[in-house]
Amino acid sequence: MKEGIHPNYEVVAVTCSCGNKFETRSTLGNVLSIDVCNLCHPFYTGKQKVLDTGGRVQKFADRFGMFGAKK
């Protein structure tokens, strides 16, 4: 590698919104805040966060249900 053209690759303290803290290496700086990590992401935990889709579906049906009704 050429000297002086690459950013410094330093140890970074990463903090997740769930409270998990760990260290990795990055060129972004010395502190990094992230939204999800391997301890809180649904893919890794196997737990799905349930959204209020039932309420949304019902709201949609109330607003636009009359268009699909046959007479």
Swiss-Prot record:
Binds the 23S rRNA. Binds 1 zinc ion per subunit. It comes from Pseudomonas putida (strain ATCC 47054 / DSM 6125 / CFBP 8728 / NCIMB 11950 / KT2440). NCBIfam families: L31, PRK00019.1, PRK00528.1. This is Large ribosomal subunit protein bL31. Part of the 50S ribosomal subunit. PROSITE patterns: RIBOSOMAL_L31 (PS01143). It holds the Pfam family Ribosomal_L31. InterPro entries: Ribosomal_bL28/bL31-like_sf (IPR034704), Ribosomal_bL31 (IPR002150), Ribosomal_bL31_A (IPR027491), Ribosomal_bL31_sf (IPR042105).
